[in-house]
From Swiss-Prot:
Pathway: Amino-acid biosynthesis; L-histidine biosynthesis; L-histidine from 5-phospho-alpha-D-ribose 1-diphosphate: step 4/9. This is 1-(5-phosphoribosyl)-5-[(5-phosphoribosylamino)methylideneamino] imidazole-4-carboxamide isomerase. It comes from the Bacteria. SUPFAM superfamilies: Ribulose-phoshate binding barrel. It holds the Pfam family His_biosynth. Its EC number is 5.3.1.16.
Length: 245
């Protein structure tokens, strides 16, 4: 499944290199027009990251996200610095289909597990941003990648399986925004270990060959941001390569 994505800072479409706010590219595009184009080309899920909200929770772009949701028919998944239940429920109330929770799942697992129980496992996607160390361990980073988390991907997945974890988005930080290709070995490994989870691959996608490689890896979806913005290929071409299930 192809999941086109946009990152937003102060209402503008941007891309960061490896999650670094100092290495930002701004695109002169209307977020709504861009997402409408992805929708018209056949996307069955869209992904939005509120980078302003991730950095400064009191400046979350909820009004803009609400406007986008109201003007699109495609289900939308939203992430970016969700720290409280109020923020989660607000996004669900304005019509967001699924909320992406990252750092908090590492820092306060019991709290996030209670949300799975309350809102259901379809309403939440865990974002696991990993640094792979020299020993090959997949260490989940927290706080917008600015600090290490110290928990392994496997230990977190085991913990959240108890509350029915169904959707997880995994990014190899070393690939994000680089157009260097996806870490297909990573996706193959986790999809083999946990076939019951819908794995979304993210980071590094540059070509349709990359899309094909991720499709073969066992991931169920692929998030594509920068490659679409710089016209490496279109959503339509990507879907032709990997039709929506």
């Amino acid at each position: 499944m192809i999941i086109p994505a946009i990152d937003l800072i102060d209402g503008q479409v941007v891309r960061l290199y490896q999650g670094d706010y100092a290495q930002q590219t701004t695109f002169n595009l209307s977020p709504l027009d861009q997402l409408k184009s992805y929708q018209q080309q056949g996307a069955s899920l869209l992904h939005i990251v509120d980078l302003t909200g991730a950095k400064e929770p009191d400046r979350r772009q909820t009004a803009l996200i609400s406007e986008l949701v109201n003007n699109l028919d495609t289900p939308i998944q939203v992430g970016g610095g969700i720290r409280t239940e109020a923020q989660l429920s607000e996004l669900l109330e304005i019509g967001v289909s699924r909320v992406v929770i990252g750092s908090l799942a590492v820092k306060e697992p019991e709290l996030v597990k209670s949300w799975f129980t309350k809102y259901g496992s379809d309403a939440i996607c865990l974002a696991l941003d990993v640094n792979i160390n020299e020993q090959g361990e997949k260490i989940v980073a927290v706080s917008g990648w600015q600090s290490g988390g110290g928990k392994s991907l496997e230990s977190l997945v085991e913990e959240f399986k108890s509350v029915g974890l169904k959707h997880a988005l995994v990014t190899d930080i070393s690939r994000d925004g680089t157009l260097k290709g996806a870490n297909t070995e990573l996706y193959y490994e986790i999809a083999t270990l946990y076939p019951e989870i819908q794995w979304q691959a993210s980071g590094g996608i540059a070509t349709l060959d990359d899309v094909n490689a991720v499709k073969q890896s066992g991931a169920t979806g692929i998030i594509i941001g920068k490659a679409l913005l710089i016209n490496q290929f279109t959503v339509e071409e990507a879907i032709a390569c990997w039709p929506n299930a």
